[in-house]
Design a protein with these regions (language model features):
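Secretory targeting and sorting signals
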Residues: 2-27
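Extreme N-terminal leader/anchor segments
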Residues: 28-105, 275
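Flexible, small-residue-rich N-terminal segments that precede or flank a structured functional core
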Residues: 99-126, 137-138, 146-227, 244-248, ...
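Extracellular and analogous surface-interaction loops
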Residues: 133-135, 223-232, 557-559, 666, ...
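Extended extracellular/luminal ectodomain segments enriched in beta-structured repeat modules
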Residues: 140, 217-220, 229-237, 669-671
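Aromatic-lined, polymer-binding surfaces characteristic
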Residues: 271-274, 280, 287-484
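Carbohydrate-active enzyme catalytic cores, enriched for enzymes
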Residues: 443-594, 756-762, 778-884, 890-892, ...
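CBM-like, beta-strand-rich accessory domains located in the C-terminal region of large
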Residues: 506, 602-914
């Protein structure tokens, strides 16, 4: 048991003597259970309030007199008069429609569906136009329609199949031109007929009535537009024509999800917006049938508390206070009977209870003086917050971000509620845990145990806030060094643009503000540099990085937005995907091989493909099966050099074969990926599918003959993917999905290269990024290696101008083309020689490089001005031919060794400058 968990166990035991035990069954906390019961001069039920705290004597007197109604009034009087205490911030501050729709018990999960406005149709036919510029500008090419009120009226909205009055999207572009689009797909779904498809109907039906989140009369409509090739939209207007017998209000939402009208049904649609409008019971705080599980978790977090409380604070409009207080007390009434632990305080568990309490504390600081807050409601809210703290004090969860959130909220509660008897124990419990938890949540190399950069960003951002909070309140934080190490880990994962690579359950977020805050908090100039895009701080002293325990390696050419970045992983843990040895690659300002993202945690087929299949990642899927996460594997090495990196990795996560992947990363602008597959059964035919994934707007194509895949983004960088054995692979562009952020998904093409073979086999692939259009002429030709099969040693001719060699087995002198080499890896072109663990390179019998002993890593670059740059680990200046490396450089005029000019000696075409 780690020290932090031991401390937690001790504090749990101590806490048991401070407060009464929680009820054995789900129930509300009684007045006596909160205020205590006084009888015959003693407390027969201990109070949860510390009546010795200044100002609480009137409450105590009322309780001892048995008058709980008076005690509640005096407790409210106390909190209304209490000086302000730092209450923390809200998780959310506002979003479109929150003030209008929340009082009607209409709520949306996530950001994939965003409210635009309410439209009115009927009576009779009516055409309406809505400004949807903000929706289009935020990357939402679709819309959905939903009834604003629960009533019997059905609206019929013309579909694209209608001869006239079909939906129209009018786009005004930056150059003043206007483009008019009709939907490429539109349809509606109907709960009473969950498997029916309505994509060819003339009308889209919209209606809703009855209690609960939906009934058999619930119908929702969806429209999707193709915005491919459209850029610079200055204004967007959506025009719809529809009819209704009487006036019918319809909510219009922007939607970031693509769909197929020929297959969309109620059953296969992931719905994120539900309405309890008109239901006297309001939200039931449970999971609607068919919804993403996150709906159950996130609705009770009270994200809307911030917008409502802040609007009340700003305007003084009591309606906002009444709405929020009503939602809080409704939640307490319902959830007190849902959870046998601490009732509404613990429902629906760990992170969700913590997020809610955090929002409630911040809201209470604003609401405590509201005339709408009654003594009864105030007591109910305080009881629930007390119960939530007790739950967070003892609840254990193995996920780092959940435990962190619990203890951060507990710490805030301990500071904000000094009146609670248990507050000192909360403070000690939370502060100790937050300092110790960084050891439990990280590997020995400093990497994060959850395989997701988005969650790590949130984890670090919360540490930024809580450490500052602790310092303001005189609470010691002792894990600064570990926090710095973890911050550096995320810094290494980040793209040169400062965005995250979106591995695991993530979306690509701008990490720079987090790095800037961490740099300021930790006084770290390198974090500050990355967080400000080089405007402050100091450039990191390193580029590439290896995390052997976390099982991740990053090859990076530098820290500016135009630098290159390649990440390869064999990592595991919570939120990981079956993506071992997957590559993400970035160059010239763009992710060229991005991670495909997550979409949702639902059972939607697209989300399951993204999260649960190996096929959805840029690695090799074996025998059509996803990888497992329990087999051997890891990053075997990262060799770094100012001119190049070499990464080696392996995994046995596919039952049929061991996959080994080697990457040569030339910082001058290319990657070569070599894969070797070693099956357990060498007789059986195995199917190996090497996949390369792109963003939705990459427009990839495959060139016949070379089978090279090239992207064609409208602007900016592109990528060519060139296989070494085009005749031996079945190459196709396949249909997949890309989720650029949570709750958004787009159709996306990806390149698939399939080999079916017994025994060992290989893939060798050139990845060639370009600043503009992709190089469609790039070629890769396999060079025979004397006395070796490709799975023993592979050699390639790249564009007929360069040669690449990789030995999979013990090094020995081998000949390929006109070259002879005795090391593990070689790359050579007219201006560069790169070698790993070798001593001799010859071309057509002439020496190019000759060292007295094997050199770990060596890069020689020949400049047109006669400058020869030599880079290598452990090399020192030497002109002694008996000790130094001989390099063929007949035109050498100057030698730079590891960044410094050094003398050199010439003997014929050879020079000696380093040993």
């Amino acid at each position: 048991m780690s020290p932090s968990w031991r401390r937690l166990a001790v504090l749990m035991l101590v806490a048991a003597f401070l407060v009464p035990a929680p009820p054995a069954a789900a129930a509300a906390l009684s007045d006596a259970g909160f205020f205590g019961r006084w009888s015959a001069g003693a407390w027969t039920v201990g109070p949860r309030l510390n009546y010795a705290h200044a100002g609480l004597k009137p409450v105590e007197s009322a309780v001892k007199a048995g008058n709980y109604a008076l005690a509640k009034q005096r407790l409210l009087d106390y909190y209304r008069a209490r000086p302000a205490i730092e209450a923390g911030g809200f998780s959310h501050t506002t979003w479109p429609g929150v003030l209008e729709l929340t009082p009607s018990h209409i709520w949306t999960l996530g950001s994939g569906e965003v409210y635009v406005k309410t439209l009115t149709f009927g009576p009779g036919e009516k055409t309406v136009t809505a400004d949807v510029t903000s929706s289009i500008a935020s990357g939402k090419p679709g819309f959905f329609l939903m009834s604003r009120h629960k009533d019997a009226v059905i609206a019929l909205i013309n579909s694209r199949s209608k001869g006239s009055g079909k939906p129209t999207l009018r786009l005004t572009l930056a150059d003043g031109s206007v483009k008019t689009l009709h939907p490429t797909h539109d349809t509606y779904i109907w709960q009473a007929h969950p498997g029916s498809v309505y994509g060819t109907k003339y009308y889209m039906q919209v209606s809703d009535q009855g209690l609960g989140p939906f009934t058999g009369e619930t119908r929702k409509a969806y429209l999707g537009f193709d915005l491919g090739g459209v850029a610079g939209v200055k204004k967007a207007e959506l025009t719809l024509t529809g009819t209704a017998e009487t006036a019918k209000d319809i909510m219009l939402y922007g939607n970031a999800e693509t769909f197929d009208e020929a297959t969309r049904t109620w059953t296969n649609t992931v719905q994120n917006t539900f309405s309890w409008e008109g239901d006297p019971g309001g939200f039931d705080w449970k999971l609607p049938d068919g919804a993403d599980n996150e709906y159950l978790y996130q609705l009770p977090r009270f994200y809307f508390a911030g917008p409502l409380a802040l609007e009340y604070q700003k305007t003084g409009n009591e309606q906002h206070a009444r709405t929020l207080i009503g939602l809080m007390t409704d939640f307490i009434k319902d959830a007190d009977v849902y959870d046998a632990d601490q009732g509404a305080g613990s429902y629906p568990g760990n992170l969700h209870a913590a997020r809610r309490l955090h929002n409630w504390i911040a809201a209470y600081e604003i609401l405590r003086k509201s005339p709408s807050l009654t003594p009864e409601a105030n007591a109910a809210i305080l009881k629930t917050m007390n119960r939530a703290g007790l739950y967070l004090q003892v609840n254990v969860n193995g996920t780092p971000n959940k435990m962190q959130s619990q203890k951060i909220t507990l710490l805030h509660a301990s500071v904000y509620f000094p009146e609670f008897r248990v507050a000192p124990a909360w403070r000690t419990n939370a502060a100790d845990f937050l300092s110790a938890q960084l050891n439990d949540s990280t590997y020995a190399d400093g990497g994060y145990k959850e395989s997701t950069d988005a969650y790590l960003r949130g984890y670090l951002r919360q540490y930024v806030d809580v450490v500052a909070f602790m310092r303001r309140n005189g609470i010691t934080f002792t894990a600064t060094a570990k926090l710095r190490q973890l911050s550096r880990f995320l810094m290494d994962q980040s793209y040169p643009s400062g965005y995250g690579p979106a591995y695991g359950d993530s979306d690509s977020l701008d990490l720079r503000s987090t790095f800037e805050k961490l740099g300021e908090l930790l006084d770290d100039p390198e974090l500050l540099y990355v967080g400000t895009s080089g405007k402050s701080g100091e450039k990191p002293a390193h580029t590439s990085a290896l995390y052997p325990d976390t099982r991740v390696a990053i090859s990076r050419s530098g820290w500016t937005a135009d630098d290159s970045h390649l990440r390869i992983n064999a990592d595991r843990g919570n939120h990981s995907h079956p993506d071992e040895l997957a590559i993400t690659a970035y160059a010239y300002g763009r992710p060229l091989l991005p991670d495909m993202g997550t979409f949702t945690y639902s059972t939607d087929a697209r989300a399951k493909w993204l999260r649960l299949t190996t096929e959805a990642h840029s690695t090799i899927e074996i025998d059509d099966q996803p990888q497992t996460s329990t087999a051997a594997g890891g990053i075997s090495h990262l060799i770094t050099n100012p001119a190049f990196d070499v990464i080696g990795a392996n995994t046995e996560s596919s039952a049929g074969a061991r996959h080994e992947r080697s990457v040569l990363s030339l910082h001058s602008g290319l990657w070569v990926v070599s894969d070797r597959l070693k099956p357990v059964d060498t007789v059986k035919q195995h199917r190996y599918e090497q996949n390369w994934h792109f963003a939705a707007d990459a427009n990839p194509s495959i060139r016949s003959g070379t089978e090279a895949t090239t992207t064609a983004f409208a602007t900016g960088a592109n990528l060519a993917i060139v296989p070494a054995d085009p005749a031996e692979v079945a190459s196709t562009l396949r249909d997949g999905y890309y989720a650029p952020r949570f709750y958004a998904v787009e159709n996306a093409k990806y390149a698939s290269y399939v080999k079916t073979a017994p025994g060992q086999t290989t893939f060798d692939t050139l990845l060639l990024p370009s600043k503009g259009a992709a190089d469609t002429s790039a070629t890769v030709e396999r060079l025979p290696v004397a006395a070796a099969q490709p799975y023993e040693a592979t050699a390639l001719s790249l564009n007929d101008t360069a040669v690449y060699y990789k030995s999979w087995t013990a090094k020995t002198p081998r000949t390929f083309g006109s070259y002879t080499f005795d090391g593990k890896l070689l790359y050579a072109d007219a201006g560069t020689i790169v070698m790993v663990d070798g001593s001799s390179v010859e071309r057509a019998g002439a020496t190019l490089v000759k060292a007295p002993a094997a050199v770990k890593d060596l890069a020689v670059t020949f400049g047109g001005d006669g400058t020869v740059r030599i880079d290598g680990s452990g090399l020192t200046a030497s002109t002694d031919p008996a000790k130094a490396i001989a390099i063929a450089a007949p035109n050498a005029a100057k030698v730079i060794l590891n960044g410094k000019a050094v003398p050199f000696q010439r003997e014929g075409a050879l020079i000696y400058a380093a040993a």
